[in-house]
Structure formats: C-alpha cells, structure tokens
Amino acid sequence: VVEFSIGMGPRLWSTEKGETRYSIKAFPFGGSCMMLGEDENESNPKAFNNKPVWARIAVVAAGPIFNFILAFLFGIVIVCAAGYDSPQLIGVSDGFPAQEQGMQAGDRITKLNNEPVVVYRDITLYMLLHPTETIKVEYERPLEDGKTMEKRTAVITPKYSEETGTYMLGIMVSGQYRPANGLAEILKYGAYEGIYCIKTAIKSIGMMFRGQVGMDDMAGPVRMVSIIDDTVKETIPYGIETVILTLMNLCILLSSSLGVMNLLPVPALDGGRLVFLFLEVVRGKPI
C-alpha cells in the first residue's frame, strides 16, 4: 500500500511508516487506499497487478463491503439506544381512504403493492415515489388475545389533502421510536437501518437517470460539511447523546450511499474495476 487516507481532498496531515504513507485529508468523507501497481504495470511481486485475480477482486470489493458493515454496526447502536419506527397505526383520519376501507388503530402495515414494510419510513418513501398510485395494502390486526395476528388486505387510492398539499392514505402513527425486544429484533432492525439507506440510494440513482432528480439535489463534500454543522447545532440543545445518535444516523446514510455509488459499473469506481476483473476471470487473461 503506497498511501492509506482517511477523508478526501487536500492532505492535512501525514506520516510514513514502513513503505506506507498514512494521511488525513480535508473532507471527512470516505477514504482511499492507493496500491502499487493499481493503475500501471509494476514488476514488483508485491504490486497489486501481480496478485491473483481473486485476490484483486477481494481487495476492490472490500471498500464497498466495509461501507455496508459500518452502516450495519451504527444501525445496531442506534436501535439499541433509540429503538425503531414501527409501522403500527395509532389511528386513521376521518374521511380518508384508510378509514373507509376499515383500517383502525393497532393495525400494522406489512406490505404496499407487494413491497415489504419493515419501518414506517418505508411507507413515507413509497408515498413519496408513488403519490397517486392505487395501493394494495397488506396489514395485520391483533385479535383479542393480543398475540395472534389476523392478516388483512385493503385496496386504497390516496386522497388529495388541501391542508397538507399532498396525497394521503389517512393513516396515523405516533412518530415515536419503539424499543427493540431482545437480540433478534436489535439485529433485525439494526441491519435494516443500513438496508433502508441502501434501498433509498438505489431508488435515488434510478430517479436521477430518469430525470426526476436534478444535480441541484445532489450534495457534494462542501454541502455535506454544511449539513453536518447544521445537524450538530440543531441537536446540541437535546444533549450529547442525541448529537452522537443523529451523526451516526447521518453516517449510515453516507456510508450506505458511498457503498452503492462505488459499486456502479463506471470505470473510475470500484464497480467498474470489478466488471473488468470478472471479465478477466471469464477470459482467463487480463483485458
């Protein structure tokens, strides 16, 4: 490894140990690992280009994979400390489709048009992307014993609300996070924090290619520094624990998005390198 860097942009600090330079750079997002022979042919047997193809695939894939692992670990911490946003209803709005279809407080939404719903954010994301679409809502209703769940289905067309200026199903949730019960739920919802952000990043990329999201909606390093600064200022009045958890939540979003972006099959990114390496596996020789 020629240089191992934390962050991007101009180098703020560095030191050399052995054959490797360790650097901290100006923008605290991501990082890089510059290896000998990564972009040019080297005769040194230690060089990247002289390693077996599966070793090179493992090295290139490690970056995005560890982005996802970091998001998973932060997700577990957040769920342990704050819980998760349950898709269980506390009520329905008068005159809206959910009430007309017989939904009520206590119902827990499980699917929207066959897309799984794990947390309430899944519902808000789906409504953001499909505001006027007729939706097959699958949900569970607790029976009298409080443990047995009855599976139900409703077909709902969102109704426009003059008050909010949006299309609504007419469902209400508490907005409060619910504690996870036991290790299984902590792992489930902790992992889903990262999965949700990965899913959102993939959908956002699709919207970008379809022209639904413009370049003005994208955030570069300078804007991200501004967002972090604003986030810290807004959460400081609620205590240091809230600041840390909010920054962790932001790190999950950044790490997941960076992992997804790096896997795009673009030559300058890890995904592009992986395409050429897998082609090398198929052909039996470098391209």
Model-derived regions: residue spans:
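Conserved PDZ fold ligand-binding element
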Residues: 98-120, 194
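PDZ-domain C-terminal substructure recognizer with occasional recognition of PDZ-binding tails
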Residues: 104, 110-111, 125-172
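Alpha-helical transmembrane segments of multi-pass membrane proteins
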Residues: 34, 67, 71, 253-263
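Internal alpha-helical transmembrane segments
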Residues: 20-23, 27-94
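Small-residue-rich helix-interface/hinge motifs
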Residues: 1-43, 261-269, 274-283
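Conserved hydrophobic/aromatic pocket- or pore-lining residues that grip, position, or stack substrates
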Residues: 137, 194, 262, 266
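Functional transmembrane alpha-helices
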Residues: 47, 51, 157-258, 275-287
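Short helix-capping/hinge motifs at transmembrane helix termini and TM-loop junctions
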Residues: 74, 78-83, 210-211, 233, ...
